[in-house]
Each structure stands twice: as structure tokens, then as C-alpha cells.
């Protein structure tokens, strides 16, 4: 796994699949540790109403100050400076949302039934895991019922599964064009071209004082597709 992928897996765990923090950390923390409850509390706080001022505005989506700052907080907690955390958060939201809506437009949206099955499978695995106690502490920390927690994950999992569908289709197109599976640089060039087109189509505007532009130079450092779409239990 690349350095970029490892950073991604750490930075978006709570927002994308908060439970994974619990499952990963459980074997490494004493039972009395409040890590799991704290993680649950942080996740629940991210769902509460907050500052609705737009920070990122695209043709099909808006990221509010509340949502943006929640992600920045997680990035800073992973060791990023304030400036780097903000830039990384801009990159993540701009790229993932732009690609998601492009995927939907192109007909790759994950079916609701498939999303629900994915959630049901993940929930079943969590309930039978060796570290179930940690999972229970996390749920307790959210202040939500299990049903409510998993329901709250629906849109996030729909986004990730849609991106996985899109990635698989584009990988097939890449190979059909005569490329070999191990042509990593060519694959990244291919992905960058599609990503840039998707981002440009959104006509992104950012609130002051933020600025960020996708370039080929920063593409592989921003945690962007295709790394973010790998379905390994902790979506990129």
C-alpha cells in the first residue's frame, strides 16, 4: 500500500466508516480506555446541525463549514498541520464529490439494495468480531441505537460503492484500450484525466480564504482516486 493510501485510510475513518477505528484499535488498547466511546461521540457530533455557511460549492453539491471543519479536525488529529489539513480536506471533498456525481451521471450509482446489503454484512461482522466490546462502547458513545447508527452510514456507503462501480468500469476501459494491469503511471494519468474533467464540470467555488486547484503534480498527494475507492473494509 502506498504512503498516500495509508494517509487516506487514517484521515477518513470516522467520517467514512467510523466503526473501523474501533475495530482496528480494539486489540491495541486496554479495556478501560475511553478511545471507543470518544470516537463514537465524535462521530455523533459530526451529524449534528452546525454552521451551514458554504465552504465548497459545486454544481451538484455543497460542503458546509460544519462538515468541512469536522474533517479538518480529524486530519489535524492524525498529525497534519492546520494548513495541510485544510488543503487535504478541500482535495478530498472536491474530488470525491465530483467523481461521485460523474459516476451517477454515467449510470454507475450503487443500487439501494446493494448498499443495504453491504451495511448488513458489515454490521453482522462487527457483531461477531473478537473485539465486540469495543464496538459496543463505540455505539454507546454515539448515543444512538445500533439501527440508527447503521442507518446514518447509508449515504456514505452509497457514495463509496458508487465510486467502486465507477473505478471497476474505468479499469475495464483502461485495459480494453490496450494497457497492461501493471502500467501504474499510465493508469494514474488515465484517472487524472477523468478526475480533472469531473472536477471542472462542477465549476467549484470556494469561500475565502480557501483555494485549491487539482493539477497533475498534486494529484497523487491529495489522496485522490483511484486509491480512495479500494473496498478493503476501510474505504480509502
Regions found by a protein language model. Give the residues of each.
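Short, low-structural-confidence N-terminal segments
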Residues: 1-82, 192-236
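Generic detector of bulky aromatic hydrophobic side chains
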Residues: 4-6, 96, 117-127, 166, ...
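N-terminal targeting/tethering segments
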Residues: 38-147
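Solvent-exposed, amphipathic alpha-helical "stalk/arm" or coiled-coil-like segments used as scaffolds
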Residues: 82-109, 136-216, 221
Amino acid at each position: 500500500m502506498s504512503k498516500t493510501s495509508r494517509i487516506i485510510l487514517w484521515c477518513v475513518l470516522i467520517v467514512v466508516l467510523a466503526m473501523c477505528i474501533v475495530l482496528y484499535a480494539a486489540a491495541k488498547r486496554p479495556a478501560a480506555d475511553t478511545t471507543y466511546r470518544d470516537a463514537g461521540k465524535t462521530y455523533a457530533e459530526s451529524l449534528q446541525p452546525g454552521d451551514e455557511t458554504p465552504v465548497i460549492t459545486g454544481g451538484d453539491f455543497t460542503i458546509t463549514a460544519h462538515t468541512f471543519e469536522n474533517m479538518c479536525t480529524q486530519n489535524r488529529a492524525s498529525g497534519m498541520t492546520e494548513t495541510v489539513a485544510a488543503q487535504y480536506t478541500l482535495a478530498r471533498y472536491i474530488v470525491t464529490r465530483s467523481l461521485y456525481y460523474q459516476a451517477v451521471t454515467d449510470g454507475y450509482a450503487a443500487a439501494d439494495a446493494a448498499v443495504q446489503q453491504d451495511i448488513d454484512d458489515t454490521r453482522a461482522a462487527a457483531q461477531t468480531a473478537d473485539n465486540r466490546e469495543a464496538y459496543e462502547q463505540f455505539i454507546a458513545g454515539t448515543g444512538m441505537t445500533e439501527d440508527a447508527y447503521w442507518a446514518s452510514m447509508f449515504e456514505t456507503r452509497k457514495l463509496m460503492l458508487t465510486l467502486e462501480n465507477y473505478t471497476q468500469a474505468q479499469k475495464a476501459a483502461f485495459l480494453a484500450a490496450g494497457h497492461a494491469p501493471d502500467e501504474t503511471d499510465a493508469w494514474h494519468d488515465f484517472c487524472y484525466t477523468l478526475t480533472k474533467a469531473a472536477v471542472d464540470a462542477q465549476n467549484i467555488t470556494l469561500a475565502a480564504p480557501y483555494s485549491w486547484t487539482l493539477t497533475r503534480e498534486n494529484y497523487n498527494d491529495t489522496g485522490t482516486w483511484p486509491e480512495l475507492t479500494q473496498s478493503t473494509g476501510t474505504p480509502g
